[in-house]
Amino acid sequence: SRIILHSRSTASRWGLGLGVDNLGSAGTGRDRNAISLSLDSPLELNDSLNLSFSDTLNHGPRYSRSNSLFYSIPYGYWTYSLFASHAEYRSPFTLSSATFYNSGRTDQVSVRTDRVLWRDQGHQLSANLQLAYKDVDSYLQKVRLGIQSPTLTVAEAGVNLFWLNSAVWNLDVNYAQGLTWFGADRDADHVQKNLPQAQFHKYRANLTQWRNGQWLGQPWQWQSQLSAQYSPDTLPAIEQLLGTDDSAVRGYRDNSASGAIGAVWRNTLRLPLNSDLAVKITPRLGLDNGWVKREHGAQSQRLSAASAGLNLSWKNVQLDVDYQHNLNTPAGFAQEPDVWLTRLSLQL
């Protein structure tokens, strides 16, 4: 008898992603590059490490840069994670033929624990606790803007429910409260009472659905996401719900809307085409709606937009093109042109 040994190939523990896109803002530069690095089980404990870096390509007087680290480690029904990030920007604007600069930075560190409470074949219920420290500095020329430069310590508690039926569902419900720990700003020190509050209370919910099917032999994939937020307090900008963004209501790039109270509903329909081509072709359509209010008593803003896109995938390369058109212009918004967005990515 003979014993024959064959080597088993295993997937690489490392992952490297490279990308370029034009998703940046007009003030800091549209064109950006991005690098992401991932490592599975660096301590051989089923843990994971992810690093990401992004920068604008113009390298002139305007820029936007960010980097982040995420590490997680499971232990039975528990998962512990650490997140840290740094971002900075510089944006010029002109008044009476003179050029001035807005600039700033944001540093964040958070620790989080998740615990699975119950699960069966089609459901999983978990709870989470998080403590985050956020430090923001904003400047006009070299003058620090105190109201726009909060230092916050935020505690959060939430529950997550994941379940399967004819679709895949995920529900997150979360409560956040600002604390006075670690040198955070104190509301008691404010002379004015209408300033953004560091010791705020905030409620958030997020419901996501993924559904697949076929129509006349054509497969389709529908993703729908509803995000809502409520706070009785005036919130710092970093804690507000953002209504205008490529991850919120698409189609608004020159104007922005955010607030303590609001909701965003995003819908994307994908139609993967059946073909013998080496390139996978997936057209898509999108329809988004949003509603935000900066604070109690403020005027609300309603947002809506439609989009059409195309994803081309070949081996480890993806090209994504998106056309976005806003369907209404809220009060105070300048008229928005239609938007073309492009992303090119390589995964190694």
Residue ranges and their predicted role:
Residues 18-22, 49-55, 82-88, 127-135, ...:
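Transmembrane beta-barrel strands of outer-membrane/channel proteins
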Residues 29-33, 63-67, 105-109, 123, ...:
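Residues that define the transmembrane beta-barrel architecture of outer-membrane proteins
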Residues 23-27, 54-60, 87-96, 104, ...:
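Sequence/structural signature of outer-membrane beta-barrel proteins
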Residues 1-81, 119:
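Outer-membrane beta-barrel initiation region
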Residues 14-16, 43-49, 76-82, 90, ...:
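Repeated loop/turn-to-beta-strand initiation elements of outer-membrane beta-barrel proteins
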Residues 37, 111, 207, 310-317, ...:
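Outer-membrane beta-barrel "beta-signal"
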Residues 139-281, 286, 293-295, 334, ...:
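C-terminal outer-membrane beta-barrel translocator/porin domains of Gram-negative envelope proteins
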Residues 47-50, 60-161:
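Transmembrane beta-barrel wall of Gram-negative outer-membrane proteins
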